[in-house]
Amino acid sequence: MVNYGKYIKINRYLQKKSISELCDGICTPSTLSKIENNKSNINPKIINQILERLSNINIDILEANTNRLKPLTELFIQRLMLNLDRSDLMAKIEEEQYNYLHSEYILFLYITKLFSNFDLYHINNKDIDEETIDLISEVIEFGDFNELYFYNLLKIIRYKNTNNRLRDFKKIIDGDRYGWLNYFYCDTLFHNGNINEAYMGTKKCYELACENCNINLMYGCILLLGLCSLELSNSNESVKYFKKLENLAPFMKYDINFVINYNLGATMLEKKNIEKAKYYLEALEANKYNYSLSSFFVVHKLGYLYTELKEYEKANYYINWINEFASKQDSKISNLLKKISDSLTIKLKEPNYLCNKKYQEDIEFIFQNSQSIFSHGFQKFYLADLEEVYLIQRRYKELYYIYKNR
């Protein structure tokens, strides 16, 4: 919903109009103050008269502009927060600047100009309009932006001394690097079964993420804390963390239920807790998955699940999806995908699959190559399968070194 009172107040400040000047002949000064402070039971006709005098606009146009411009503004904010190029969006925003001043995103033009060339790693010592910064600081909550992130940016931009800016950003960047290293360490502890240690380490990592306003790291830590809480049979604690995920989800643009079901399901599947994995993963079946890498990770878990459950029709459907996806990739990725689908097919069809030489070779190949092509997490998913293969092959020494290196 458009915040009319805030819109009127900001425009009045920008146009340097007094309350008495703006409300003359329309309403009393106290009524205008109530409008600006969003008091209820104000006649919409009075609000429209104020808007028309202020900006030659009415409520309907204000709402229409808000809805029309929202996707562009959100995309700019996303790129800014990921430190990506925004020049093409800035050009569109410049074209629309008149309309930005007539929408819920009245401040957006100022934000984009202030941060149009802002680079976290190359900070220019340029003069910033203090009045603009004050205005943004006062009403940053007006837009659908991440307040904590912009609060930190504004705080550092205010520094007159460039060295201070660089020092603080280097501190944040170093903190981010340290934070991510600790996060991955805690994630490994979790998958190795050291749940208490993973939980305590992730809590410290989360505190660092909050200090540095690293939204992505905050998100990962909260999810891991929720998983740890479930493993520790603390359901109340896990609910608290998943509720925090909901608070971050709108910015991250993730479907929170999808994220939770996928991560819990994949974790249970990796731990070979098949019934719990099914409880979470089967909720993802209703989605349609296009042939993309992000879809592959979900389809792979579903295919793996139904292979374990020996549900042939569903397992074959997802195995065929992987084969079709593989045909669209370059040889390096395609080869790995083919090994994955072949291993699932053998596991599905042969009761004594562990003794199948091709299955053994495929699993070893997947484990050895999946980290460089996909991720460390994907490699870890296949550790239990590799362990089964090495045990049946009596390759105890190699298995020992894998655990030692981890």
Predicted regions and their residues:
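Alpha-helical residues within helix-turn-helix
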Residues: 10, 20-21, 45, 49
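A short, Lys/Arg-rich alpha-helix, primarily the initiator
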Residues: 1-14
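Extended amphipathic alpha-helical coiled-coil/heptad-repeat regions
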Residues: 112-398
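Short alpha-helical DNA-recognition segment
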Residues: 15-34
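DNA major-groove recognition helix of helix-turn-helix/homeodomain DNA-binding modules
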Residues: 43-61
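Residue-level detection of the helix-turn-helix DNA-binding "recognition helix"
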Residues: 13, 27, 37-38, 52
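Helix-turn-helix/homeodomain-like alpha-helical modules used for DNA recognition
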Residues: 69-120, 294-298
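TPR-adjacent "capping" and linker segments in tetratricopeptide-repeat scaffold/adaptor proteins
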Residues: 58-71, 173, 371-374
